[in-house]
Structure formats: structure tokens, C-alpha cells
Amino acid sequence: ADVPGNYPLDKDGNTYKCFLLGGNEECLNVCKLHGVQYGYCYASKCWCEYLEDDKDSV
């Protein structure tokens, strides 16, 4: 089963770009900033597991 999640958005409403695919410390930090524990780089954007629709950008 796929784990639900979302692409977090920055304060300008943009996704977080990343270059190192898969496990990515930068994305991990971004996801923690958004209140979830785990995420990784997918299709050059940070993806956070279990992140709700991200309306409250940080």
C-alpha cells in the first residue's frame, strides 16, 4: 500500500526542490519543519510522508 503524503510548500507556495533523490537530509529537515517525521526527494521535489494537504506554508 502506498503511504499517504504530500509535497510541502514554502512560504511562497512553492515546492522544495532537491537534487539528491531518495533519502535526503535537506528534505528530512523540511518535513520536520512541517511537523512530520519522514520524507525524501522524489522527482526533484521534497515529499513528506503523512503530510496533510499543505495549506499552511512555512
Curated annotation (Swiss-Prot):
Expressed by the venom gland. GO terms for molecular function: sodium channel inhibitor activity; toxin activity. Disulfide bonds join 18-41, 27-46, 31-48. GO terms for cellular component: extracellular region. It comes from the Eukaryota. Residues 3-58 form the LCN-type CS-alpha/beta domain. It is found in: Secreted. Belongs to the long (3 C-C) scorpion toxin superfamily. Sodium channel inhibitor family. Beta subfamily. This is Birtoxin.
